[in-house]
């Protein structure tokens, strides 16, 4: 029987500027709202692949909240742990691409419904039904989210469940009080670690990748996957190293690609796939994600990933 995957964290909508520029200081055309939030994108990808999936979060009793609930339910995610808060607003993020490819964001998360998450009886019951916990670093940056996420980690690992961890550390949250302690606490229990690029150096004393990987393996992390964006990805464990090359795609919107990659890798990893197989499908999931505007719009089914790999490898 497949393990049921739980994540905890922010749910919001994303609204995307259709022109490139630096920020939102003038009226401009926008598209959206799109369902979003790194944990929500991750768990939606898990659900799309048919792996049992669930999320604990909090949304407002508004159209933005319902938009997210409808998408997650349609993609097979257990939403019994999502509290719908009357009189509160669902979080939002406005995104605009700069000419150099970087992004400008305006967030409303901390003061949205998600920012007031607490441990509810429904959330506690959901924790008891899950065998694997996935932590996003963003969920450790707000007190309510962090408390619930760490409680889920404690309960699931105490029963022998497994833990995956994607730091997903945006620059604007790195100085959050208590974040470093929370990150270290989660890493100490992690079975599968999924940093992007140079994030791995935030967790080690090493100054080169091989030494950083060795340090983490020596500390008890079983599997490490380094996401390299358009440079592919690498898996490391005690048995060695596996690399996959990037897939060639037409990038439209990279937001959410790393979350889709992570969701696909965790799904295949939990199913017992070899590192090479899990990397291939995760790579395809990330590549598919960048072809759609909207961070959750590119979450793919197994058939869609098979087709993409068939085109790329055939």
What is each residue range found by the language model?
Residues 1-6, 154-155, 205-314:
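Conserved phosphate-binding/catalytic region of the ribokinase-like
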């Amino acid at each position: 029987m497949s393990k049921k995957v739980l994540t905890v964290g922010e749910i919001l909508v994303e609204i995307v500027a259709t022109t490139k520029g630096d920020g939102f200081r003038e009226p401009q055309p926008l598209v959206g709202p799109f369902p979003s939030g790194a944990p929500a994108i991750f768990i939606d990808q898990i659900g799309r692949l048919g792996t049992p999936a669930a999320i604990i979060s909090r949304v407002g009793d508004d159209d933005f909240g319902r938009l997210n609930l409808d998408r997650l339910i349609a993609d097979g995610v257990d939403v019994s742990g999502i509290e719908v808060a009357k009189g509160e607003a669902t979080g939002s993020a406005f995104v605009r691409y700069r000419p150099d490819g970087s992004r400008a964001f305006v967030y409303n998360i901390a003061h949205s419904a998600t920012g007031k998450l607490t441990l509810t009886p429904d959330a506690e019951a959901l924790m008891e039904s899950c065998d694997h916990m996935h932590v996003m670093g963003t969920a450790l940056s707000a007190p309510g989210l962090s408390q619930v996420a760490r409680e889920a980690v404690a309960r699931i690992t105490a029963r022998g469940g497994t833990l995956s961890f994607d730091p997903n550390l945006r620059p604007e949250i790195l100085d959050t009080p208590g974040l470093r302690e929370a990150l270290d606490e989660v890493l100490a229990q992690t079975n599968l670690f999924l940093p992007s690029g140079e994030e791995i150096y935030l967790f080690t004393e090493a100054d080169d990748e091989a030494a950083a990987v060795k340090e983490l393996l020596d500390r008890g992390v079983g599997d490490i996957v380094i996401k390299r964006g358009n440079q592919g990805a690498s898996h490391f464990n005690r048995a060695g190293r596996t690399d996959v090359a990037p897939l060639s795609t037409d990038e439209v919107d990279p937001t959410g690609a790393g979350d889709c990659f992570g969701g696909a890798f965790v799904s295949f990893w939990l199913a017992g796939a070899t590192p090479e197989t899990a990397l291939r499908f995760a790579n395809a999931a990330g590549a598919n994600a960048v072809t759609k505007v909207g961070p959750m719009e590119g979450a793919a089914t197994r058939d869609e990933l098979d087709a993409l790999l068939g085109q790329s490898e055939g």
